[in-house]
Structure formats: C-alpha cells, structure tokens
C-alpha cells in the first residue's frame, strides 16, 4: 500500500522552515477526578434500618384469622379478591425470591422484613417466599407474619413452577408516586 500523500523534498523543506522557532508541547498528565459524593456507610445503615422497621410488624403472639381449609391464602381487607384469583392462577410472576430453608424463626423474620423493604425500594409488585416443608414451623409462621405486615396486599400458595405448597406468592403494596 503506497502513501497517497507523499511530499517531495521542496514541500518538506517548506514545512520545516514554517515551523522553526516553535516549541514542543509537553503532554498534560493531570487527570481530573470526578466530583462524587462519598457513599460510605449510609446505604448500609439505611438497609439495616429498613430491615428492622419491616421486621417490627411480625409478632409471634398475634394470630390473624386465616382460612385453614384449602391452600394457604390471604387478602387484606379493602384489597381486590380478583388479585388473589390472579395469584392463584399464576398470572403474576415473581421478580424477587426468598428462600427460608435452614433459617431460624428470628432470621426468617429479618429476611422477610428485608424482602418486603426491597420490594418497596425496587418497586417489585410480586415476590415468592419459599418456606419449605421441614418441621412445618416456618410453613405455619410465614403466613401469620405476612398477614400482619401493612405492605402485604395478598398472598397465595404458589403454583407448582414456583414451589407449590412449599412457597407463597406475595403481592406488595407499592408507594404511590408523589406529584411534587
């Protein structure tokens, strides 16, 4: 491949005479750092506070009135029963999953609180909580805890593809966007 723009000797000499007396510039080696806020521990503290706030609603003594016949289900008073029907049919697919296998009741409450806080923060409407079968401790307690939380609109036993009777699909009330 040949050089398209080759210069003859006269043109090179003319160029060299035209640039005489100029100094070579040094490269500017200063790198500009972007102005950012330090993230620090604020998000970690906020996440911990959300988790504590969300688990505050879970009491072991309170026994809400849940239907004992048929699959595990609940709909908050004032919420649409049609939403519960859509949960049962599997019309909603969960975006977040929580597996409670192997956790103690205290750990399960904290993780459940963190899940509900994450759902509100990330604007997730449907989540799946897998409590498993085990000794039926978490299987019995999880619906009782969920029914106490004010952000839970409804829950229903999950369809087979999401865990069947070892899991619950949960609908979470999202914050209404402010018009300010």
Swiss-Prot record:
Residues in the signal sequence: none
EC number: 3.1.-.-
One GO BP: rescue of stalled ribosome
Keyword RNA-binding: yes
Smr domain span: 98-173
GO terms, molecular function: RNA endonuclease activity; rRNA binding
Record-linked InterPro entries: Smr_dom, Smr_dom_sf, SmrB-like
SUPFAM superfamilies from the UniProt entry: SMR domain-like (SSF160443)
Pfam families, alphabetized: Smr
Keywords: Endonuclease, Hydrolase, Nuclease, RNA-binding, rRNA-binding
PROSITE patterns: SMR
Role this protein plays: Acts as a ribosome collision sensor. Detects stalled/collided disomes (pairs of ribosomes where the leading ribosome is stalled and a second ribosome has collided with it) and endonucleolytically cleaves mRNA at the 5' boundary of the stalled ribosome. Stalled/collided disomes form a new interface (primarily via the 30S subunits) that binds SmrB. Cleaved mRNA becomes available for tmRNA ligation, leading to ribosomal subunit dissociation and rescue of stalled ribosomes.
HAMAP family per UniProt: SmrB (MF_01042)
Subunit structure, as described in the record: Associates with collided ribosomes, but not with correctly translating polysomes.
PANTHER family: DNA ENDONUCLEASE SMRA-RELATED, UPF0115 PROTEIN YFCN
Homology family: Belongs to the SmrB family.
Protein's name according to its UniProt entry: Ribosome rescue factor SmrB
Native source organism of the sequence: Pectobacterium atrosepticum (strain SCRI 1043 / ATCC BAA-672) (Erwinia carotovora subsp. atroseptica)
Gene: smrB
